[in-house]
Regions:
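Conserved N-terminal phosphate-binding loop of PLP-dependent enzymes in the Aspartate aminotransferase
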Residues: 1-176
Length: 176
């Protein structure tokens, strides 16, 4: 509200989060959509795009290059978005949240069984999940990341104190 009162535009960077929270936009999940003036999306859309309110609409020709897409990428992105919109991916009971609950549940189950006490604080939001390995130190995080990579799983580090392992889950996962 302060930014609105001061005429400061609010920019939502949804490059990573677009469609990954159970809503199309993370700002919808956070309940702050009314304050967003500019929003960038990519990845799931198969294209980088900048969305904006009428007030911040740029003059023709101002956006180009990086923000442009090829016809095949735009077509693929549209199909993906249509599928997510019409095939039950979005919403609190949608496939995105089901994948989240299943994956976090599996991490917690690992912590209770074969990896007893080695994985802590599994959680996150939608298709973005993180877990704290071992004691949460940088050294343990690095060792686990290298071991996961060596075994064919690409994961990323995040956080500090504790250091965590993050997963960007694909929306096509199933229990099978």
């Amino acid at each position: 509200q302060f930014c609105r009162e001061q005429g400061i535009p609010v920019w939502a960077d949804e490059i990573q989060t677009f469609t990954r929270t159970g809503n199309f936009f993370a700002y919808e999940t956070m309940g702050i959509g009314e304050f967003i003036d500019i929003c960038t999306i990519a990845k799931t859309a198969q294209n980088g795009a900048t969305l904006f309110t009428e007030e911040f609409k740029p003059d023709p020709g101002l956006l180009g290059g990086t923000f442009s897409g090829t016809t095949p990428a735009l077509s693929a992105g549209l199909e993906i978005l249509n599928m997510m919109d019409h095939d039950g991916y979005m919403g609190p009971q949608g496939k995105v949240m089901q994948i989240h609950h299943d994956f976090v549940g599996m991490l917690n189950e690992l912590n209770e069984t074969s990896c007893k006490g080695l994985l802590r604080e599994a959680g996150g939001l939608g298709l973005m999940v993180a877990v704290t390995p071992l004691d949460g130190s940088k050294d343990k995080q690095t060792l686990l990341l290298k071991s996961l990579f060596k075994n064919g799983l690409i994961c990323f580090g995040c956080g500090s104190n504790p250091y965590r392992i993050r997963f960007l889950l694909p929306a096509i996962l199933s229990k099978a």
